[in-house]
Amino acid sequence: MQIAVLLSGGVDSSVALYIMIQKGYKNIKCYYLKIWLEDELSYIGECPWKEDINYVEAVCKKFNVPYEIISLQDEYYKRVVTYAIEELKIGNTPSPDIFCNQRIKFGAFFDKINEHYDLIVTGHYAKIENKNDHYILKQAKDKIKDQSYFLSHLSRKQISKLHFPLGDLLKTEIRQIAQKIDLPNKNRKDSQGICFLGKIKYDEFIKYHLGELKGNIIEQETGKILGTHNGYWFFTIGQRKGIKLSHGPWFVTEKDIQNNIIYISNSINYLKQGKQQFLVHKTNWINKPLNNGDLSAKIRHGEKKIKCKIEMLKNDIIKVDLEEKDYGISPGQFCIFYQEDECLGGAKILKTLT
């Protein structure tokens, strides 16, 4: 069996490689996907991916496996970064990591490698089950680290080639393994945020591409101008961080894109702003829901799932009715559907209702 392992330089993918070797697999080649955007990195004066490469090289040397660096920067910019920028321009909240998995790690990478591989192994926190050639994507044992949300837009064909060795392990167990086998990167911190940013702050990335534009911050209930902001594209519905005003905490409740206005509400009135119903479109079903199964949804990456009902409307639009209110539903985000711990797929949020 020919196996490709995607290494990031982090602990998770390195432990995934170790597990495959421990299981007796021999024909393994590792790949590092270079998707760093050089223009965005120029002002921080260093190349963060070089540290990744050093760790990848050290891990592969330890286990005596070959590795190759594959540059996917052009593909990443065209298929993911451009999408994120266009969504921000129209006031939506993009989810770049979903498309990074669908279009790059398991899209462009699949297209790029000439060798034939029976299995692609990564350090994602998720599970894949195969029941008579029927592939199921499931949540990981570690529900806090679970990444099924970001894998929800893969096709069944993509899933059929994947294996996630960490799906039945907790993060603490993975750290213990790394220490026990003395991995070169055993003490390396986990990466945070969007896959391509690394040391770049998200707001800095947005500023680089969209600049700044002064606008008013208005209290939702009174219409009173409370302050100014640097552009609606820096904010998302439900956001609290970054609103530096007294008498808070304040939360974003609405964005007026035409007039570059951010509406906010304080903690008391904010609780009245929650939504339970919204429309989604552009659905990707890995497996369609069973009629007799309870359905739940994730509006964002994290542990929380909310029970819901769905109604199929015209033009492939789906109405979602949550069992409880959510306070951060924003167009452009993705709603991912689950039955128990199976990830069925997901859809892009079109607009909120009530």
From Swiss-Prot:
Gene Ontology molecular function, alphabetical: ATP binding; tRNA binding; tRNA-uridine 2-sulfurtransferase activity
Residues noted as binding ATP in the record, renumbered to the chain: 6-13, 33, 123
GO cellular component terms listed in the entry, alphabetical order: cytoplasm
Gene Ontology biological process terms from the UniProt entry: tRNA modification
Catalytic activity: S-sulfanyl-L-cysteinyl-[protein] + uridine(34) in tRNA + AH2 + ATP = 2-thiouridine(34) in tRNA + L-cysteinyl-[protein] + A + AMP + diphosphate + H(+)
Family stated for the protein in its record: Belongs to the MnmA/TRMU family.
Stated name of the protein: tRNA-specific 2-thiouridylase MnmA
Species this protein is from: Borrelia turicatae (strain 91E135)
